[in-house]
Amino acid sequence: MAKSSLLSGFFCFLVLFHCSVAYSGRQQREQQGQRGQRQQGECQLNNLNAQEPQHRIQAEAGVTEFWDYNDDQFQCAGVAACRHIIQPRGLFLPTYTNAPHLIYIVQGRGFQGVMMSGCPETFQSSQQSEGGGGRREGAGQRFRDQHQKIRHFREGDVIAIPAGVAHWCYNDGDSELVVVTVEDLGNNQNQLDNNPRKFFLAGNPRQQGQGQQQQQREFHRRGGREEHNFGNVFSGFDTEVLAEAFGVDREMARKLQGQDDNRGHIIRVEGDLQVLRPPRSREEQEQQERGSEYHANGLEETICSARLHENINDPSRADIFNPRAGRLTTVNGFNLPILNFLRLSAERGVLYRNAMMAPLWKINAHAVLYATRGEAQVQIVDHRGQSVFNDRIREGQLVVIPQNFVVTKQAGNEGFEWVAFTTHENAMFSTLAGRTSALRAMPVDVLANAYQMSRDEARRLKLSKEETVMMESRSRSGRRDVA
């Protein structure tokens, strides 16, 4: 009897375990398959191009430039890209998007607010910290501001923003702030179509685009699907509804709608922006200490306390380094856990003069490469063995490298630096040459038969390079050997 009960319990456990594994596997396949289903039939790429931004929208204190997301390479990867140039004391108005995105700080510094729904307002002022800036709310009372966390950022930071999360940023430096953003429209967090959408919570961004209407009409005649146009969501509501919802008068409700605001989506702040924020030096020191010692256990972060940015500009934190060729630094779900939720990652590469990056392919992700300095000769080859890109890419240009397409880069005389945004939280690659390459892992006889060469030739091919990913130029090493 006991044996029968034990056997029945064992079978019940097997059934429950099988159902749990099946459900988990189905859920994972649904998440991973959503991108493939959306882009099915859209990756027949015969030619890739290094592109400059195609459209620009001017505002009072800056400009936003857009790459043409209707281009085949962007449609294949399911991404959209733009570049913001924000002047000193420029405030990028609060907005949210329909897809998660990564931001890379190319130049400058500033601070930002990210409004996580339901999270507490942990930054609170006191009467002492207000000084003379607080305004009185009745006799003997001083207004004490409180808001969600303010985060500093600087050149080299990668910032992660989930879909539908409102955020703003401010340039508190003395030079222009240059920011590149890539949205992952094929992500499972985007339940709309593959058109990027920005929902602004202030101003009158639509007004700024009136000067570009002729350009937009021409763009539509060429087959573009949607304008790079956006507006203040409050402007669509009746004034009475807003007045009732916020408990204010109609005049203040009209200010929410920005009806008379012609400054655009990046506005200039008079004086300086007064917000509660920690000293920059203290926050940067904490980030550096956390970056060198951080070991996540998967339990210590909630959505309200999650780290949203990581700096990948520090040479001492490189993941791959060759003192004669260059370095590669990655940020992924291991060192920035929020990326496991966004299913995105990024890398920053530096190639020294004439150095080469080994031919490789991304195993599980598309890559969007943006050149930040210098130039390089880049070649990309597809599954048919045909070159779909063989050209130089220069600073400010962008190219999409589809999943599994093989790519190699060789820096010019001034070197080459780039940042690549990848559509997987832990993007992996495999090389074709070097000590950790696919060819190095094959038996000599397999190489000899596959390439119709002798075993000695196959052995030389297999052992020809001891470098891994970053490779020194043969011409440079040859000159050093002669010397």
Task: Label the predicted regions.
Residues 186, 375, 425:
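Short, glycine/serine-rich, charged loops/turns that create anion-binding
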Residues 2-334, 345-348, 358-364, 420-422, ...:
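An N-terminus-focused feature that recognizes amino-terminal "leader" regions
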Residues 95, 333-335, 339-421:
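C-terminal, well-structured subdomains that either form a transmembrane helix-short loop-helix hairpin
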Residues 409, 427-430:
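Short active-site-adjacent structural elements
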